[in-house]
Amino acid sequence: MAQAHLAGSKKNARREGRLIVFVDESGLSERPTRVRTWAVKGETPVVQFHFNWHQLSLIAGMHFNGVCFRLHDGTIAKEQVVAFLKALLAHWRRPLLILWDNLQAHRSRMVRDYVASTGGRIKLHFLPGYAPDLNPVEFLWAWLKRHALANYCPDTFAELRHSARGKLKSAQRRSIIIASCWQQAELF
């Protein structure tokens, strides 16, 4: 059902020469994503970390053969969403069909006004509720947290920011990661 919901948007995007870009947000903190690991027999692995509520927010847009991302301290609000849409237009230099969830910032007046000011260069489509598996960017976040930064314990927030940026830049260069995100979403 949800895939049929997106089929019309996909056909129209191709007819209009638009890039289909999925957008999503996520967050990281100095508290690690703990995953199963190996250790010497008889020695329990210990993950020591700083308990801190400071959050690094991530926003990414993914096209079939590329990803564009930004990092922000704190939460992502409508201002950051508009700035990111501007960055996407500058990055891909083509009309865009943005597919994203129903986050309040995505539906804000500021975002709607900006999209209207682009002269049709951006069209928005909202994904069905409770369907994160339709967004390939969700699988990028899973890779980042469960593989690239799994059990990672930064000493400072700046170190977390540096590592997250480095791992996301690595994902940009590795087409196999982007392809696997699309494959897991089972959309195209």
Where are these regions (language model features)?
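Short functional hotspots at interaction and active-site rims
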Residues: 1-188
